[in-house]
C-alpha cells in the first residue's frame, strides 16, 4: 500500500512537472493583453497616436490566448487517464486546472472591462456591447486557429499570408463554422457571468473602502492637553 501511494504521488508530480511548462507559457500569453489593456484603456491621456493603434492591434492579436486556456481541458482528460486515482484527480489535478483556466479567462474578462471603461470614458457607451460581441467572435476564430491550425499570435507578422489564406479557407467549412458558433456562445455566456461576478467584487471593495473612510472621518479625535 505504501509503495503504491509513493508511486502514485510520483506519477502526479511527474504529470504536474510536464504541465507546468505549457501552463506557465499559456498564462504568460494570456496576461499580455491584460497588461496592454491597462496601458491602452486606463491611462488618463486620451490621444490615440500611431503607437496606441499599434498596441491596440497587438492587444487583439494576443487576446484569444486568454480564453484559449478553456480548450486546455483536453490535457486534463489525458492526465486523468494517466493518474487513474479519484482522490488525486479531485484534490490535486482538477484544482490546478481550474486555477489556470479561470486565471486565463479572468484576464480576458478584465481586459474587456478595461475596454468598456475606455469606451464609456470617451462617450461611446453604446458601443460596449457591440465591441464585446465582435471581440467574442474574433476570439472564437483565434481559438480555432490556435487549437486546430496551430497558429500563434506572432504568425500575423512572421507568416501573414498563411494566416489569411489558410485561416480563412479553413473556417468556411461546415464543421469549423459549427465549432466557431459553439465557441462564440460559450465565450459570450461565460464572459457575461464572470463580468458580473468581477464587477460585483470591485463594487464591494469600493463600498468597503468608502465605508472605512467614512468611519475614519467620523471617529472623534482626542487632543493632548
What are these regions (language model features)?
Residues 3-30:
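Hydrophobic transmembrane alpha-helical segments in integral membrane proteins
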Residues 141-163:
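Juxtamembrane non-transmembrane "cap" segments at the membrane-aqueous interface
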Residues 40-51, 117-127:
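Membrane-interface helix-boundary motifs at transmembrane edges
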Amino acid at each position: 500500500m505504501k509503495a503504491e501511494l509513493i508511486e502514485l504521488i510520483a506519477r502526479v508530480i511527474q504529470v504536474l512537472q510536464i504541465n507546468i511548462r505549457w501552463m506557465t507559457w499559456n498564462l504568460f500569453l494570456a496576461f499580455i493583453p491584460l497588461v496592454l489593456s491597462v496601458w491602452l484603456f486606463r491611462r488618463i491621456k486620451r490621444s490615440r497616436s500611431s503607437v496606441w493603434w499599434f498596441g491596440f492591434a497587438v492587444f487583439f492579436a494576443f487576446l484569444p490566448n486568454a480564453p484559449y486556456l478553456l480548450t486546455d481541458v483536453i490535457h486534463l482528460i489525458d492526465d486523468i487517464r494517466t493518474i487513474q486515482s479519484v482522490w488525486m484527480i479531485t484534490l490535486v489535478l482538477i484544482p490546478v486546472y481550474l486555477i489556470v483556466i479561470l486565471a486565463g479567462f479572468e484576464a480576458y474578462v478584465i481586459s474587456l472591462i478595461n475596454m468598456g471603461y475606455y469606451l464609456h470614458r470617451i462617450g461611446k457607451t453604446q458601443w460596449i456591447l457591440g465591441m464585446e460581441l465582435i471581440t467574442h467572435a474574433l476570439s472564437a476564430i483565434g481559438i480555432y486557429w490556435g487549437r486546430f491550425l496551430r497558429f500563434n499570435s506572432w504568425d500575423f507578422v512572421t507568416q501573414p499570408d498563411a494566416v489569411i489564406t489558410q485561416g480563412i479557407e479553413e473556417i468556411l467549412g461546415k464543421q469549423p463554422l459549427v465549432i466557431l458558433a459553439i465557441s462564440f456562445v460559450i465565450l459570450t455566456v461565460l464572459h457575461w457571468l464572470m463580468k458580473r461576478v468581477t464587477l460585483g467584487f470591485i463594487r464591494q471593495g469600493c463600498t468597503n473602502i468608502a465605508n472605512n473612510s467614512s468611519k475614519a472621518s467620523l471617529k472623534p479625535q482626542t487632543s493632548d492637553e
